[in-house]
Regions:
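Active-site-proximal substrate-binding groove within the catalytic cores of carbohydrate-active enzymes
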Residues: 2-197
């Protein structure tokens, strides 16, 4: 498999895998059916191979429950359970389940800076998420005519003040190292969360 070739050829000990553990596909072509159960089995086989062959830190993007035991941390876990307007409000169900199993981060802050630091801080506190930024050392305009043009926001030097603000605010409150145990709606768009530890 692709996972095996990367591990064997490159000798990695830490990897971040975008769809493995968080995507199950199927294909119903005649005489070559591939069901979601087959996809699940192949995913588990790849995750087993990775963890049994030198991968000590495995980052997965919002992994499904079958991948929990392989994950060192989860990336880009959505703050809200759904975007459907018909619901009154959303609870961080995923975070309540995985809190204490592995670390997880929410949205990449500089990829969604239109929401503002305060918005991100409030959602980090509400969900127990880690802070997430994506950075490049070089000027990100170098990426404009490449396949990586969507990383236009990554130049580290432009984000140092935001990083300091967000991290110092979260550290001052001291939620990390604690367990998220309760989430309750107090009033419209006002939530009370409980941490223990």
């Amino acid at each position: 498999t692709l996972v095996e070739s990367y591990i064997d050829d490159i000798g990695l000990t830490s990897v971040s895998l975008k769809n493995l553990g968080s995507s199950l596909a199927s294909d119903y072509k005649r005489r070559n059916e591939f069901f979601k159960e087959n996809s699940l089995q192949e995913s588990v086989k790849a995750l087993e191979y990775a963890t049994n062959n030198g991968i000590k830190n495995l980052s997965l993007y919002t992994p499904y429950d079958f991948a929990f035991k392989y994950a060192s941390n989860a990336l880009e876990v959505p703050y809200a359970a759904t975007q459907y307007e018909v619901l009154d409000y959303s609870i961080p169900f995923y975070q309540l389940v995985v809190n204490g199993l592995f670390d997880y981060s929410g949205e990449v802050i500089n990829a969604h800076d239109e929401k503002g630091n305060q918005w991100h801080i409030m959602h980090i506190l509400e969900t127990g998420s880690n802070v997430a930024f994506t950075f490049s050392y070089e000027d990100s305009t170098e990426l404009i005519q490449t396949d990586y043009k969507y990383y236009y926001y990554t130049e580290y030097s432009k984000w140092t003040q935001d990083v300091k603000e967000v991290i110092s605010t979260i550290d001052e409150i001291g939620i990390h190292g604690c367990e998220l145990t309760n989430h309750q709606l107090v009033a419209n768009n006002i939530y009370k969360v409980t941490y223990t530890g």
